[in-house]
């Protein structure tokens, strides 16, 4: 009985040793796992701190530093306002781009006709293209005579003697289209011509000053006395002096500049929309004025 009990005790001890031997590596493995978890946590915190450093970055040069403004002799309210500068955090807003780059669709099209004007001469001499020769498409060439007139008009060099090309047509009766084209081009040249500028050698009033309304006394006088007409018995020079005196145009020894100002004033009155409307109203009023004159009521209309 004693031997059997001792054998049973030994077997139990062996079983306990096996259990402990099986449990010891598991404990070691768990300890290693704990160490690995600690390392992972530390690496994650390091990476987070690195990301924060990258986001915030180093302080920019010239940025706001609260230490620079601590010594200012200001009240507590102003110092409180300075604290709002450091508290403010700007918001990142993604702006939508209105213009986006894109590649346009390929659209085949017929190009311009190549007139071969860029081809150099075979002898190698310069052709002065663009200086002496105008680079134009071959489909619509300009008339050299009209072009020289345009250049002369734009440069305002009318007194320079130069060789001008004179265009002539053979059998003009059979080519009316060329004549119409010439008339149209010359008419366009005259339409685009700016008005002539005249510089007076003596002081002359402005056109706007001469177009001002007359005084009521003078208008009343004109209602009683009519203006002198060309049938008056006087010379042409005296008649010019009278008309210029009525219109407040000064007259000097040479009456050419006074006459130019007189005709310029007449042209301004003729082209004025205001006086055109007055003239049309006067024409429309003529029948009624006749009826009133027949009734015996006289009315005088003055336009200034």
From Swiss-Prot:
Localisation: Cytoplasm, Cytoskeleton, Cilium basal body; Cell projection, Cilium
Which organism does this record belong to?
Homo sapiens (Human)
- According to the UniProt record, where is the region Disordered? 1-67, 285-304
Phosphothreonine PTM positions read: 286
Protein role? Forms part of a complex involved in intraflagellar transport (IFT), the bi-directional movement of particles required for the assembly, maintenance and functioning of primary cilia. May play a role in chondrocyte maturation and skeletogenesis.
Any idea what this protein is called?
Intraflagellar transport protein 46 homolog
Q: Which InterPro entries match?
A: Intraflagellar_transp_cmplxB (IPR022088)
Q: What is its main location?
A: cytoplasm
């Amino acid at each position: 009985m004693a031997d059997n009990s001792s054998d049973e005790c030994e077997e139990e001890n062996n079983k306990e040793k096996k259990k402990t031997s099986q449990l010891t590596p598991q404990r070691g493995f768990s300890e290693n796992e704990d160490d690995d978890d600690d390392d992972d946590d530390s690496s994650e915190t390091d990476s987070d701190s690195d990301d924060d450093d990258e986001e915030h970055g180093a302080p920019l040069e010239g940025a706001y530093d609260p230490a620079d403004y601590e010594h200012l002799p200001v009240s507590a309210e102003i110092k409180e306002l300075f604290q709002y500068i450091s508290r403010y955090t700007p918001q990142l807003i993604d702006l939508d781009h209105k213009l986006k780059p894109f590649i346009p669709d390929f659209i085949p099209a017929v190009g311009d006709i190549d007139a071969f004007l860029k081809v150099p001469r075979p002898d190698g001499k310069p052709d002065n293209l663009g200086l002496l020769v105008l680079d134009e498409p071959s489909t619509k060439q300009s008339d050299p005579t009209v072009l020289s007139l345009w250049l002369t008009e734009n440069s305002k060099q009318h007194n320079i003697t130069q060789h001008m090309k004179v265009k002539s047509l053979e059998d003009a009766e059979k080519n009316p289209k060329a004549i119409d084209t010439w008339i149209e081009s010359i008419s366009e040249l005259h339409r685009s011509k700016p008005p002539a500028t005249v510089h007076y050698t003596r002081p002359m009033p402005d056109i706007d000053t001469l177009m001002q309304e007359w005084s009521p006394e003078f208008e009343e006088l004109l209602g009683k006395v009519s203006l002198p007409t060309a049938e008056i018995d006087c010379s042409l020079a005296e008649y010019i002096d009278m008309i210029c005196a009525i219109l407040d145009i000064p007259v000097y020894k040479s009456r050419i500049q006074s006459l130019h100002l007189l005709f310029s004033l007449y042209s301004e009155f003729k082209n004025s929309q205001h006086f055109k409307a007055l003239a049309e109203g006067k024409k429309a009023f003529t029948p009624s004025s006749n009826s009133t004159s027949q009734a015996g009521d006289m009315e005088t209309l003055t336009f200034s």
